[in-house]
UniProtKB/Swiss-Prot annotation:
May interact with CcsA. It is a multi-pass membrane protein. The keyword Electron transport does not apply. Required during biogenesis of c-type cytochromes (cytochrome c6 and cytochrome f) at the step of heme attachment. Belongs to the Ccs1/CcsB family. This is Cytochrome c biogenesis protein Ccs1. The keyword Chloroplast applies.
Amino acid sequence: MNYIIKFLNKLNNLTVAIIILLAIALASALGTVIEQNKNTDFYLKNYPLTKPLFNFVTSDLILKFGLDHVYTSWWFIFLIILLLLSLTLCTITRQLPALKLARLWQFYTNFNTKAKFQIRFKTNSSSLTKLTYYLEEKNYKIKHFNHFVYAYKGIFGRVSPIIVHFSLVIVLIGSMLSTTQGRTQEAFIVVNQEKPVLDTYEAYVNDFKIAYNSQGLIDQFYSDLILETRQASKIQKTIYVNEPLNYSNITIYQTDWNIDNLVICIDNQNYYSIPLQFIELPNGSESKYWINRLDLFGQSVFCVVNDLTGIVYLYNQNKDLICISSLGEFITLNGHTITFNKLVASTGLQFKLDSFIPLVYLGFLLLMISTLLSYISYSQVWLVKNGSTTYIFGSTNRAKFAFIKQLTEIANQC
């Protein structure tokens, strides 16, 4: 039991809390730099032992310490729990007692206590009533006791640190639950087809389009979606990168795209849907190519497509270019007419079901509220009457010069 108490006392320390927070920030940075939730071969290929990232991050380190899934690793969750405990202990043992003390009426019945205060005045006025009236005009709460007066205002300024801690606790709990309990699914859905997702929804793709810039490079890609629930409610939206679909607790992100099939017509009679295979080029090239080998009329040809503009390249077995064709254009091969009719595309989507996002939003809302409350000054004034002289003592947690100016005005009016 003593060990637990000592451990909790260690956690109830600002320095320890900052160290834990820095450790979480470092882990989060690694989780941002290192691709998450990829297969083992990906890390072996991209983080070789011979060329470590930052001179120390290798595939062995990533796989051994769970850096391939940082946010769901046991040690990251443990750091979150430690920070939660530290914030909770600080709130209970420091912030709440400070608030309780602030709410108590604090009387100083001896003018000799003036040494306690950096802000102090004296006036020849013997009327506490007049001074009290001026304080009330400045929205102070007043408490009388014989020849002594205690006044305060801005108690909400003392509440803001507690709300900060409380909001951070909510954000951390919401983020942890979101990471461990939320569900994510990635899928490619062909245009004009639907697919069940996350056991509860059906996603249907009406259309998929790509916008190109003046240099012929991809500028943006769009998916026109219909999301249907088991309750038969539907929502439709055209999404694109950085503009997801949000419905209830599900969010759908536009992530990728693919070309699945090439529809061809031979001799204006027979239609065939030819599957295309994506080819990843070496040296990290960003260009995309889809290819298929066809045996047409005793001749092997390669159909190559690199976008949805409708341009098809035909190569022979020697990798020599035979011709370049567009969709709907007729070409002749060994006496037969061939038409490339259609490219069948699919859109790459990420579906994220998370019931705890509202909890995270609530935490950030409270954090913003606490930031506004922190600008409220908590000010206290003591009036101590001694014969024909009245002493004015003051204390504030911020805006000290404005507070001094206010007390000076009150003293001068008397």
